[in-house]
Structure formats: structure tokens, C-alpha cells
């Protein structure tokens, strides 16, 4: 491929400009992706606003429910963090809030924010199943067309964590906060939506749903390496076989496979650890089928995962609600029926 002199000069100018822009560091001013317009923030607990900026930069955070201006400086790694007090939600009051984050001349504004209860919803396909039909075995909610048509609940918001696999804990994750409406409701987790709707109707406070789930995933995939390594039985059962396998030497990509979704730690690293600075009212867990052969150790595994999450979120009393996987065709004389739950 041949370039004219003018094209080469233009290319060199663009590269030089891009390099100087990167060295200046202004482009790295950012806030965590979980902090967005349309979000619900947890009532009665500090809101942690965090992100990155050029090392040593002053970052200013203002919110419209507190008169104080909050300031901090990014550390040597470019990380910064500020805690903002959050009041309790008032039932029936849905005043929308704003947050402004600035560094130098750069200002980021978050709007249409509500204060309420935020729930972390995780597990496998039982939790991931949307209100609308998706796959032959994920048929959606009963009367899903009527449910979607009536899903006009702007005080219910959803952040669906983008499914991903990581060998090491990630700083951030993908996803977008959306407001519940007939347009967006089809993509809501059915279980999370009906749970949120019932709580909202009873309590009249906004409900945020952070759904972090992947079909077919195992409990060990949602548990940290340290947690599995520090328990001799869990290490022997899950971590050691994986660490000595061919799969552990592969570079992990984002392609979903049945083999990959049961690997230890990968969803914790990509889809739980990035949420570490959020506060939650509690967690909903609907999983179990992919651990159906691990009945002798599953209780121990779940207990350690819960302990792991509570430590991560700095909340030793964080409520954790299980949905027991229901027996499937239990009345039939089929000793394999439990596999189809």
C-alpha cells in the first residue's frame, strides 16, 4: 500500500497528537461504570464514588442532597475515591437526584438518580431468565406479553452486568442502568423483576437490581481464589484440579462455553469483584443445577462464597436469600429427573 506525502504527514500528526494526549493523562479521568445516570443508590449507607484520573489530580464531587463539596486526590496509581452520606428513602417520595464529578475542566454529570434499596441478584439461568422468551428452555414469564405491557415502574431500575470471564479480579465491568418500562422490561430478569415489583408495591421506595448471572454457571465460578485456596476441601475439589489442567493455561476470552462457565473464580473476578464498592440491601441467589453432583460439599461451598461476598462488600450481616432449586417431574419414576430442574 502506497501513501502520498500529505497522507503520511496527516498520519504522523494524528499519532503525535494522540501520544501527547495520552501523556497528558486527561483522557483517563473516569468514574466506575456502575455509577451512571438512572441508577438507584442504597439508602442509609455511604455512596462510594470512585474512578481514575492522572496521578495527583484533584477530583471534586458534588451532590444535590448535601451542601458540602467533597474533594480528594488521585493516588500514584491514578485511583481516587470519595464517600458521600446518603439519607434514608422516604416512602412515596421519588425525587430525582444529580451528581457532578469534576477534574480540572472536565465535568461528568449523573442525573435521574433515585435513593432506595439495591439488591444483588446472581446465579445461573434460573436468575438470568428474562421476562420475554429467549431459548427453548427459557420460556419467559407466564403471560409475559401482559406482564411486559403493564411493566410501567420507573422507580425500578436494572443494571445487568455484562457476562465476562477473567482469570484475575477486574477493576470494572460492563453494563447499563435502565429504567423499567414496557420497552425495557422484556430484558429484565423475570425473578428479579417480580421480586422488585412486590417490594416496591409494599414499601413504596425505589428498587435497584444489579443482576450478575450466567446460565449454566457453578457456585465455585462465583467464588474468589483466596476463598477456595484457604479451604482444604474446596481447594482439593475445585482449585487444584483446575490449576493443574490444560484449561488453566489458556488465555480466557469472552466466548461462553459449557466447559468455561464452571471454571473456578472466573465470574467472581469479572462480575462480582468490580461491584466491591457498591452497597446492597441484600443478595438473591438462584443456582444449584450445575453443582447437582456436589451435594456432599455444596453447603460448605455456598457458606464460604457468602462469607467471601460479605467481606468484599464490607457488610458481615449482608442478607443472603436462597431460592431452592425445585424438584422437576419428581412424581415420575425417573431417577435422572433432578438433572432437569
Q: Which role does the model predict for each range below?
A:
Residues 1-26:
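Bacterial Sec-dependent N-terminal signal peptides
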Residues 23-341:
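Cell-envelope and extracellular/periplasmic
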